[in-house]
Amino acid sequence: MPGLNCRFYQHKFPEVDDVVMVNVRSIAEMGAYVSLLEYNNIEGMILLSELSRRRIRSINKLIRIGRNECVVVIRVDKDKGYIDLSKRRVSPEEALKCEDKFTKSKTVYSILRHVAEVLDYTKDEQLDSLFQRTAWVFDEKYKKPGYGAYDAFKNAVSDPDILDGLDLSEDERRVLIDNINRRLTPQAVKIRADIEVACYGYEGIDAVKDALRAGLSCSTENMPIKINLIAPPRYVMTTTTLERTEGLSVLNQAMSVIKERIEEKRGVFNVQMEPKVVTDTDETELARQLERLEKENAEVDGDDDADEMEAKTED
């Protein structure tokens, strides 16, 4: 079956001042020819004068064939199909918003395209109809093309009744819900940071323990923090959460508390690795490190009684 195609949004053309995602197809004397990815790959052009605010010394440093770019629409002739675009007029903030909108809209597109394939649709018109009866309904309802459908689909993971008002057959509804759940069900991520905490004063060991406990107190019920000793003075902090941004924030907050507490005792605090989402490979390597250190420490008398500190619910 040939691949089905459809634009992301109900309107067939972008409006002037819209920031859109394009893919560069070719570069000519006049400028760069691009495909508007959100509008079923209709053609547009970035004039050379709209590539950069600075003098152009090398076009290839500004734009390359095959690369995606965020550009702003400066002219649309719907009758002739001409779309003029500018790269130099897009601010960094606008580019970030464009990337976010494109990512979410592409997710909705992927879900509906897969629904169409599962249901053996063979014509682009059938996919277009599916968009009209689902994604574009929510885009229009919330007046947010791209975001409306994504937010509605995401909420449908926990509340499928959101889809009740849509004009769908039983098969369409069933397959749509299955695909929404498969693509948008939140996945837990593990976030890790590596720190060094030390205090060489008379009560140095107690000062370190006190600082780490203060960091652990930043744990929440949904985001428990763990702190493991790698090798003095280095520790690894981890938390597992469904909310990536909040998880990063909680670890940063805990690190700030540890830093403040240990420095009150004239101790030392250094960040060896900023909080980041870690992969299974990272975790496997960390587990090997901890296992190796555990074996080494088992041979040493007088080990500290805790290589791992976990958040506790004690008052």
Swiss-Prot record:
It is found in: Cytoplasm, Stress granule; Cytoplasm, Cytosol. Activity is regulated by phosphorylation at Ser-49 and Ser-52, which stabilizes the eIF2/GDP/eIF2B complex and prevents the eIF2B-mediated exchange of GDP for GTP, thereby preventing the formation of the 43S pre-initiation complex (43S PIC). This results in the global attenuation of 5' cap-dependent protein synthesis and concomitant translation of ISR-specific mRNAs that contain a short upstream open reading frame (uORF) in their 5' UTR. GO terms for cellular component: cytoplasm; cytoplasmic stress granule; cytosol; eukaryotic 48S preinitiation complex; eukaryotic translation initiation factor 2 complex. The keyword Protein biosynthesis applies. Phosphorylation at Ser-49 and Ser-52 stabilizes the eIF-2/GDP/eIF2B complex and prevents GDP/GTP exchange reaction, thus impairing the recycling of eIF-2 between successive rounds of initiation and leading to global inhibition of translation, while concomitantly initiating the preferential translation of integrated stress response (ISR)-specific mRNAs. GO terms for biological process: cellular response to amino acid starvation; cellular response to UV; negative regulation of translational initiation in response to stress; PERK-mediated unfolded protein response; response to endoplasmic reticulum stress; translational initiation. GO terms for molecular function: ribosome binding; RNA binding; translation initiation factor activity. The modification Phosphoserine is found at S49, S52. Residues 292-315 are annotated as: Disordered. Its main location: cytoplasm. SMART domains: S1. InterPro entries: NA-bd_OB-fold, S1_domain, S1_IF2_alpha, TIF2_asu_C, TIF2_asu_middle_sf, TIF_2_asu. Residues 299-308 have a biased composition (Acidic residues). Gene3D superfamilies: EIF_2_alpha, Nucleic acid-binding proteins, Translation initiation factor 2, subunit 1, domain 2. Keywords: Cytoplasm, Initiation factor, Phosphoprotein, Protein biosynthesis, RNA-binding, Translation regulation. Residues 17-88 form the S1 motif domain. Eukaryotic translation initiation factor 2 eIF2 is a heterotrimeric complex composed of an alpha (EIF2S1), a beta (EIF2S2) and a gamma (EIF2S3) chain. Belongs to the eIF-2-alpha family. PANTHER family: EUKARYOTIC TRANSLATION INITIATION FACTOR 2 SUBUNIT 1. Member of the eIF2 complex that functions in the early steps of protein synthesis by forming a ternary complex with GTP and initiator tRNA. This complex binds to a 40S ribosomal subunit, followed by mRNA binding to form a 43S pre-initiation complex. Junction of the 60S ribosomal subunit to form the 80S initiation complex is preceded by hydrolysis of the GTP bound to eIF2 and release of an eIF2-GDP binary complex. In order for eIF2 to recycle and catalyze another round of initiation, the GDP bound to eIF2 must exchange with GTP by way of a reaction catalyzed by eIF2B. This is Eukaryotic translation initiation factor 2 subunit 1. It comes from Xenopus laevis (African clawed frog). The gene is eif2s1.
